[in-house]
Swiss-Prot record:
Upper taxonomic lineage: Bacteria, Bacillati, Bacillota, Clostridia, Lachnospirales
Subunit architecture: Part of the 50S ribosomal subunit.
Biological process per Gene Ontology, one example term: translation
Region feature (Disordered): 1-54
Family that this chain belongs to: Belongs to the universal ribosomal protein uL15 family.
Protein name: Large ribosomal subunit protein uL15
Organism: Lachnoclostridium phytofermentans (strain ATCC 700394 / DSM 18823 / ISDg) (Clostridium phytofermentans)
Amino acid sequence: MNLTDLRPADGSKQSGNFRRGRGHGSGNGKTAGKGHKGQKARSGAPRVGFEGGQMPLYRRLPKRGFKNRNTKEIISVNVSMLNRFEDGADVTLESLREIGIISNPKDGVKILGNGELTKKLNVKVSAFSESAIEKIKALGGNAEVI
C-alpha cells in the first residue's frame, strides 16, 4: 500500500448540498458567507435597471415616437434587379422569390425606377413608381398592378 492509494473510508465524506447558516459549529453559521450587513447581505436582488438610487438611464432619456401597428411593410425592388429574368418573362411575387430577389413579401412589392432595364418583361406586382412604369413600357413590356 502506498500513500497515493489512500482513500477516505466509505460514509465518512458528506455529499449533496451544503447547508449554510446552520450554527457556528458548522463553520458556516451566523452570516452564512454573506459578510456583514449591506445590500449584498440582504435577500433578493435589486430589480433590473436599478442604479443604486440615482435616476436610471431609462428614465433619464425622453420618450419619443411610437410604432404604428397598422403600417404596411412593402419591399422595394429596383428595375435594374429585374435584368436577372429572361427576355419576355412574367415577373410575379412568386418568380421574384424563386430567383432570390425577395425572401418574404409581407404586404407586397413596389418596383422603383433606379438603374437601367435591358429586357422586355411583363411585371405584375403590388405597386410601381412612375419612372419604373416608363422604363418597363419603353422596352415594350407591361406593368400591371395586382
